[in-house]
């Protein structure tokens, strides 16, 4: 029996060694598979993070672009509203010039005085309406010549009363709406 017992023990040792080898091989394969799965999962997570970052960047850019567009539209709307009377003002300037010429004429008689008074009231009403819209006269008489505001149509020699580059006489009034010139003043400039 001792031989049988010995053989049985040897068989058990051999079987146990083989089983241990098989188990360790299986464990190694399982560990390698788990490591591969972990690497793949980490790679997928990194890819998803990169995609998320890209999408967040696109979202932020689109949001900033939308905000810029809204600001630009608001500014354009304000500019349009501010200068809405520009064309009408340009069209009214000849009428104002004519009314000013009519008021400058000397009249005789009560009826003519009454008519002149009506023209003055009409002129004042137009000036007031234009002023409410931001249209105002450009001051020129005695001012330094500014080519952005004045149009020199004639020059005269400079004197002590009228130094060089100053406006001596205004031939036609100029007007501006806020910071835009509707019509430059036609002036005589000392040289």
Swiss-Prot record:
Domain of life of the source: Bacteria
Compartment annotation: Cytoplasm
Reported function: Participates actively in the response to hyperosmotic and heat shock by preventing the aggregation of stress-denatured proteins, in association with DnaK and GrpE. It is the nucleotide exchange factor for DnaK and may function as a thermosensor. Unfolded proteins bind initially to DnaJ; upon interaction with the DnaJ-bound protein, DnaK hydrolyzes its bound ATP, resulting in the formation of a stable complex. GrpE releases ADP from DnaK; ATP binding to DnaK triggers the release of the substrate protein, thus completing the reaction cycle.
InterPro entries: GrpE (IPR000740), GrpE_coiled_coil (IPR013805), GrpE_head (IPR009012)
Family to which the UniProt record says this protein belongs: Belongs to the GrpE family.
Keywords from the named record: Chaperone, Cytoplasm, Stress response
Subunit structure: Homodimer.
Protein name per the record: Protein GrpE
Stretches with biased composition (Basic and acidic residues): 1-21
Pfam hit, one: GrpE
Annotated GO CC locations: cytoplasm
PANTHER family per the UniProt record, alphabetical: GRPE PROTEIN, GRPE PROTEIN HOMOLOG, MITOCHONDRIAL
UniProt GO MF annotations: adenyl-nucleotide exchange factor activity; protein homodimerization activity; protein-folding chaperone binding; unfolded protein binding
Gene it is expressed from: grpE
GO biological process: protein folding
Residue ranges that the Swiss-Prot or TrEMBL entry lists as coiled coil: none
Region annotation (Disordered) ranges: 1-39
Acidic residues biased stretches: 22-38
């Amino acid at each position: 029996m001792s031989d049988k017992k010995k053989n049985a023990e040897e068989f058990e040792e051999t079987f146990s060694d083989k089983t241990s080898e098989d188990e360790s091989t299986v464990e190694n394969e399982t560990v390698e598979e788990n490591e591969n799965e972990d690497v793949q999962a980490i790679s997928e997570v990194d890819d998803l993070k990169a995609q998320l970052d890209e999408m967040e960047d696109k979202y932020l850019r689109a949001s900033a672009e939308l905000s810029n567009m809204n600001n630009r539209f608001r500014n354009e709307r304000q500019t349009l509203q501010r200068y809405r009377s520009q064309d009408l003002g340009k069209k009214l300037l000849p009428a104002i010039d004519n009314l000013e010429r009519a008021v400058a004429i000397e009249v005789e008689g009560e009826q003519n005085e009454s008519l002149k008074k009506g023209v003055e009231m009409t002129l004042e009403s137009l000036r007031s309406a234009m002023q409410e819209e931001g249209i105002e006269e450009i001051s020129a008489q005695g001012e330094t010549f500014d080519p952005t505001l004045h149009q020199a149509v004639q020059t005269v020699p400079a004197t002590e009363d009228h130094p060089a580059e100053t406006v001596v006489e205004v031939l036609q009034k100029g007007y501006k709406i806020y910071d835009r010139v509707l019509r430059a003043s036609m002036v005589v400039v000392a040289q």
